[in-house]
UniProtKB/Swiss-Prot annotation:
Sequence repeats lie at residues 4-7, 8-11, 12-15, 16-19, 20-23, 24-27, 28-31, 32-35, 36-39. Mediates phase variation of the LOS 6A2 and 12D9 epitopes. Phase variation of H.influenza LOS epitopes expressed by LicA is determined by a translational switch. Belongs to the peptidase S49 family. Between 2 and 19 copies of the INQS repeats are to be found in different strains; these are thought to serve to generate phase-variable expression of this gene. InterPro entries: CcrZ_PhaseVar_Mediator (IPR052077), Kinase-like_dom_sf (IPR011009). Residues 4-39 are annotated as: 9 X 4 AA tandem repeats of I-N-Q-S. This is Protein LicA. There is spontaneous, high frequency switching between three discrete levels of expression (++++, +, -) of oligosaccharide epitopes. Lipooligosaccharide (LOS) is a glycolipid that is a necessary component and antigenic determinant of the outer membrane and has been shown to be an important factor in the host-parasite interaction in a number of Gram-negative species.
């Protein structure tokens, strides 16, 4: 009888201790989460009123929040450590307020996350462009070397197929030509475009010939900015990040972007297109030839657009080195290959 009582008491005590420990852990977790949320609200609230990275850095120093700058081509990105939890903070570039519709970005970003294609984004303020995403531990952006490997490209195709055939629909259409008009309207010195090269009149004329390229195409959700840095690999799972330019488009536009931005070899580019066409059941000789022609047109138009984009940014004091020249050279090279 005594043995039975001891066993019962031990069981009761274990149950009580487990309950107490669970309660303590819940209380601790709630306290930590509250602390994290308070810090996030403070940081985001400050950044909304200030687009100067140096002032944000000073604010983080003042509040003893560990951080490190991780760069970014169009925005300043900062890695934060808030109570042991890592986040990536985007300090938006003020010029981008005129270039990017943040409401579309916020909507599309959320849709992509729900589909498992994007990282968690606790904050994306549509008015200011301030964004806070969860940092993925043990993850790396894809390199140009990786993207020239068939195993990596196959994984990219799987993500593209999921994106382009998803059930959700983005609210906006991404058109290279509409974007061009917007950027050109913001360019104060128009001659910076037309006097960049003696062949600009020809380039411009050919560019506008393709304005109806998507006329009979079923537009699908697209990322539209799949540079290697926007593809994040964690173990065997691939994420597409930074949905600033996302919108409905020809799915081949995403493939064209990867070919251009990752500088794929001809073999890798052909493999990417063939694998994608196979997965979408569109791989036969005629379809492939048509797709190949459309890819070159998209690549040409992308280079023209990003050349202009760079000139707009440079007018506001940003330094992109020879990036604009490389874009223009690529456009002229493709111009000679166009059908």
């Amino acid at each position: 009888m005594q043995s039975i009582n001891q066993s019962i008491n031990q069981s009761i005590n274990q149950s009580i201790n487990q309950s107490i420990n669970q309660s303590i852990n819940q209380s601790i977790n709630q306290s930590i989460n509250q602390s994290i949320n308070q810090s996030i609200n403070q940081i985001v609230g400050f950044v909304k009123t200030c687009y100067k990275p140096e002032e944000v850095f000073h604010f983080l120093h003042q509040h003893s929040i560990p951080f490190s700058s991780i760069g970014g081509m169009t925005n300043q990105n900062v890695l934060l450590n808030i109570s042991g939890v890592k986040f990536v903070l985007r300090i938006p570039n003020a010029v981008n307020l005129s270039l990017i519709n943040r409401e579309y970005e916020a909507f599309n970003n959320a849709q992509a996350y729900r589909a498992g294609l994007n990282v968690e984004t606790p904050v994306l303020d549509a008015k200011s462009g301030v964004k806070l995403t969860r940092y993925l531990e043990n993850s790396n952006t894809l390199s140009q070397i990786q993207l020239n490997e068939q195993s990596c490209l196959s994984q990219v195709v799987n993500n593209l197929y999921r994106l382009h055939n998803s059930e959700f629909v983005f609210r906006n259409v991404f058109s290279v030509f509409d974007e061009f008009r917007q950027y050109f309207s913001l360019l104060e010195n128009k001659s910076a475009f037309y006097q960049a090269d003696s062949r600009m009149d020809k380039l411009s004329a050919v560019f506008w010939q393709f304005e109806e390229i998507n006329k009979d195409i079923i537009l699908r959700p697209c990322h539209n900015d799949l540079v290697p840095e926007n593809m994040l690999l964690q173990d065997d799972r691939l994420f597409f990040i930074d949905w600033e330019y996302s919108g409905l488009n020809d799915p081949l536009f995403d493939i064209a972007t990867i070919i251009e931005e990752a500088h794929l070899s001809k073999e890798a580019a052909d493999f990417l297109l063939e694998t994608y066409c196979n997965q979408t059941n569109k791989y036969h000789k005629t379809e492939f030839q048509i797709a190949h022609k459309r890819l070159k047109i998209h690549r040409f138009c992308q280079n023209v657009l990003w050349f202009l984009w760079t000139k707009v940014k440079e007018e506001h004091g940003e330094n992109f080195g020879d990036y604009a020249l490389k874009r223009l050279d690529a456009a002229f090279k493709l111009l000679e290959e166009l059908p």
